[in-house]
Regions:
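C-terminal capping/extension of enzyme domains
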Residues: 1-6, 139-162, 179-239
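Glycine-rich anion-binding loop/nest that anchors nucleotide
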Residues: 27-28, 165, 169-184
Length: 239
């Protein structure tokens, strides 16, 4: 079984990868993975060994999990990260071809010294919304079901992310996964009043631009879609 005390600390304190002083934040619903108890135990152990940071370095963290192929040659693209890289590159007016995306994932995505960060609304890695394995690994009562977990964790995580954004005031926060729009609007503190013709929402609140996009793993989504998101962010810098 997992160390439930450490697991609960992780649920309250871990938010993702990169630096929250970055001007571009990506926030998703939850991280993929979490297919075995051993993987989760390694996630917790490495997090504890590094001082239980709220934000980790994505490369160091995944190297410790045995997933270093995402950060060394030949770079293995991670499907979600690849499109977030494409957004970031396009937002800076840089090429977003395959080689550029691989280089960005390898060197510039979610690092402690990077200009972006990757956060998750829900802290526990899971292979999908239809899978919930934690009752097999933990005695925490609220983890006995996914619904119980969400009921317990979502309100506090929404509050924490909202407060962090208000304190740090990043230039742009990109929420990906439009089916979670209600949660994203709760964090932004505003409805997404404009829907861009390219299919994403935008609103500006207290100096921060908030975008809501399709999930990179959504069926039928194209590279051009995420390129257009990045170009839109770039256009906001000129306003």
């Amino acid at each position: 079984m997992l160390d439930d005390s450490l697991l609960e600390d992780f649920i309250h304190s871990f938010f993702g990868y990169g630096s929250d002083s970055a001007d571009l934040w990506f926030i998703g619903m939850e991280e993929g993975g979490g297919t075995t108890e051993d993987e989760i135990a390694r996630r917790l152990s490495f997090w504890q060994s590094r001082g239980q940071n709220e934000l980790e370095d994505v490369c160091d963290y995944h190297e410790a999990l045995g997933m270093g192929d995402f950060f060394r040659e030949p770079v293995k693209l991670q499907r979600t990260w690849a499109q977030l890289c494409r957004i970031a590159l396009s937002a800076q007016g840089e090429p977003d071809d395959l080689a550029a995306v691989k280089a960005f994932q390898r060197d510039r995505l979610g690092r402690w010294n990077s200009s972006n960060c990757l956060m998750e609304l829900l802290p526990l890695a899971s292979p999908g919304t239809g899978h919930w394995l934690y009752p097999n690994w933990s005695k925490l009562r609220f983890l006995s079901s996914r619904e119980g977990y969400k009921d317990r964790v979502l309100p506090m995580r929404i509050r924490s992310l909202k407060q962090r954004i208000e304190e740090r005031q990043p230039f742009c926060v990109v929420f990906y996964g439009s089916v979670y729009r209600d949660h994203w609007e709760s964090i932004a503190g505003s409805a997404f009043t404009r829907i861009d013709p390219d299919g994403f929402g935008w609103v500006k609140k207290n100096g921060t631009n908030f975008l809501i996009t399709q999930h990179p793993a959504a069926k039928g989504i194209t590279n051009q879609y995420f390129q257009s998101v990045g170009k839109f962010i770039r256009s906001l810098r000129r306003l």
